[in-house]
Swiss-Prot record:
ATP binds at residues 172-179. Its EC number is 7.1.2.2. F-type ATPases have 2 components, CF(1) - the catalytic core - and CF(0) - the membrane proton channel. CF(1) has five subunits: alpha(3), beta(3), gamma(1), delta(1), epsilon(1). CF(0) has four main subunits: a(1), b(1), b'(1) and c(9-12). This is ATP synthase subunit beta, chloroplastic. The gene is atpB. Produces ATP from ADP in the presence of a proton gradient across the membrane. The catalytic sites are hosted primarily by the beta subunits. Gene3D superfamilies: 2.40.10.170, Bovine Mitochondrial F1-atpase, Atp Synthase Beta Chain, Chain D, domain 3, P-loop containing nucleotide triphosphate hydrolases. GO terms for cellular component: chloroplast thylakoid membrane; mitochondrion; proton-transporting ATP synthase complex. SMART domains: AAA (SM00382).
Length: 495
């Protein structure tokens, strides 16, 4: 009779002869793999484990080497579920990092972290693959031109304008409108955008990947009749996937974007939702690898991981990458290490406010917390800069007066302060805007407002030219002419 132990020893000895490693320990998504002397895989090499589980079903798991433990053992993180794996199973070292298909054949398709299609439209017919771990461009290759990236969203274009070829972060807690704002930007920008887009779904709900996919199909960014004419590639790693997949799905999306920038020399527009999930996945992996946690339980390598991923998605002289990233803010605390580390890499931060969302002001962009490196008079022009500063000063004064108003009421304010409050409330309402992607819920058609129209509108409110119009006339309108027309309609209704 052959015991299980002797059978396992026999299997392992055969694998060693064939120069294939074997699993010695499994702790959830983390595996220890032993290899023959002198044949240890390098850090980031991918290992492939194939076999059958006890029920006889085929298993195919890809892992990435994270640590060299000594004694010819490595520790690897699985990119898919480890259900059914057993000690002693063979692990083949591919001799290189994980590589994914890149190029035009990825457009219109949804891939996972391994570059495998998950949209039931057959395999991706690509002969070109890139490794997901690549160096950031050298300083000499970087593009330093400064130009505004118009979005058609009033409050964004005026107060915290985006830089073409820059990095943009949408910061907000749960349920304040980050994903809707990303979908609105896809609608406003990706349609008119001459290059291609890459959408990276990092550890979010499946629904939040499905909604943009349907939106892209409706707006013909994804062409169902002729998939090769699509303008976007999608890479998803949802919440239910192991931390290894959630940690690396952003690298897969970056790799696809880099191909379009470096090889095709195109302008690329990557959307990443959500950066915090990437950090959380890294935190899970870090704990499983036995590293000492840092502040608030995050991984000690948070700054390094964030830097290496952010520095890759940058603009070079070959092509620009304008990345738009949603950043979930835990407990609405912007000083949390994850959003604080992310903001250091960004050219513009759009902060979404729960207070504004509660008032029904959408997009709920906070005019005082949102920042942009482009908000300089020598970049945006004196007129734009002065208007934006006027809006911020009025909003700041209104914020300072709110405690007094809450305790004593408006009547106790000076005439000048009452006037400031009235204008600030009109500015707040004029900052709202009907959304294209929310048309089905609101029933009001979306509006795209040019930067010149936006500046003109706020310039009329600030000095008091429109003091005679009621506040509600400014709510959910496009340009200032629509507000005037709405005021006239409200007056007729009142009579």
């Amino acid at each position: 009779m052959v015991t299980k132990t002797s059978f396992l020893s026999f299997e392992i000895s055969e694998l060693v002869k064939k120069n294939v490693g074997y699993i010695t320990q499994i702790i959830g998504p983390v595996l220890d793999v032993a290899s023959s002397p002198g044949k240890m895989p390098n850090i980031y090499n991918s290992l492939i484990i194939k076999g059958q589980n006890p029920a006889g079903q085929e298993i195919n798991v890809t892992c990435e080497v994270q640590q060299l433990l000594g004694n010819n053992e490595v520790r690897a993180v699985a990119m898919s579920a480890t259900d059914g794996l057993t000690r002693g199973m063979g692990a083949v070292d591919t001799g290189a990092p994980l590589s994914v298909p890149v190029g035009e054949t990825t457009l219109g398709r949804i891939s996972n972290v391994l570059g495998e299609p998950v949209d039931n439209l057959g395999p991706v017919q690509s002969s070109t693959t890139f490794p997901i771990h690549r160096s950031a461009p050298a300083f000499i290759q970087l593009d330093t031109k400064l130009s505004i990236f118009e979005t058609g969203i009033k409050v964004v274009d005026l107060l915290a304008p985006y830089r073409r070829g820059g990095k943009i972060g949408l910061f907000g807690g749960a349920g304040v409108g980050k994903t809707v704002l990303i979908m609105e930007l896809i609608n406003n920008i990706a349609k008119a955008h001459g290059g291609v887009s890459v959408s990276g779904g990092v550890g979010e709900r499946t629904r939040e990947g499905n909604d943009p996919y349907m939106e892209m199909k409706e707006s013909k960014v994804i062409n169902e009749e002729n998939i090769s004419e699509s303008k976007v590639a999608l890479v998803y790693g949802q919440m239910n996937e192991p931390p290894g997949a959630r940690m690396r799905v952003g690298s897969t999306a970056s790799t696809m974007a880099e191909y379009f920038r470096d090889v095709n020399k195109q302008d690329v527009l990557p959307f990443i939702d959500n950066i915090l999930r990437f950090v959380q996945a890294g935190s899970e992996v870090s704990a499983l690898l036995g590293r000492m946690p840092s502040a608030v339980g995050y991984q000690p390598t948070l700054g390094t991981e964030m830097g290496s991923s952010q520095e890759r998605i940058t603009s070079t002289k070959d092509g620009s990458i304008t990345s738009i990233q949603a950043v979930y803010v835990p407990a609405d605390d912007l000083t949390d290490p994850a959003p604080a580390t992310t903001s250091a890499h960004l050219d513009a931060t759009t902060v979404l406010s729960r207070g504004l969302a509660a008032k029904g002001i959408y997009p709920a962009v906070d005019p005082l917390d949102s920042t942009s490196t482009m908000s300089q008079p020598w970049i945006v022009g004196e007129e734009h800069y002065e208007t934006a500063q006027g809006v911020k000063q009025t909003s700041q004064r209104y914020k300072e007066l709110q405690d007094i108003i809450a305790i004593l009421g408006l009547d106790e304010l000076s005439e000048e302060d009452r006037q400031t409050v009235a204008r600030a409330r009109k500015i707040e309402r004029f900052s709202s805007q009907p959304s294209f992607v929310a048309e089905v819920f609101t029933g009001s058609p979306g509006k795209y407002v040019s930067l010149s129209e936006t500046i003109k509108g706020f310039q009329m409110i600030l000095p008091g030219e429109l003091d005679n119009l009621p506040e509600q006339a400014f709510y959910l309108v496009g340009n200032i002419d629509e507000a005037t027309a709405k005021a006239a309609a409200l007056q007729v209704e009142g009579q």
